[in-house]
């Protein structure tokens, strides 16, 4: 991709390195830009910007271990992965959590997971 992305997701994180590593692994994304305040991740499907919450705000945020899914969040992004089974392992190995069952969908199967800070996302595996 050349030039700025036309579409993407910006996500705030208390622990920039931890959250970035989660999405790098689960989405197979690579870091295309990094500085102390944010990381820009790129996969074939999406650009994800992980932005560090300012320290004075982050100090008041408590993140559970394992993470507590934020079921009341207003938006849940979805991402397509090659294999839900592989993604599930990656989620658990990078501090995330599996949330709920796998559901069949038209031409796909889907699963909810949360990242290490409790942000819910929807993973999709398309039918071969």
Which residues does each PLM region occupy?
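Short glycine-/small-residue motifs
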Residues: 120-123
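A conserved hydrophobic helix/loop-capping motif in glycosyltransferases and polysaccharide synthases
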Residues: 10-12
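Vicinal oxygen chelate
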Residues: 1-7, 29-80, 86-114, 125-128
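Conserved active-site tyrosine of GNAT-family acetyltransferases
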Residues: 19-24, 91, 118
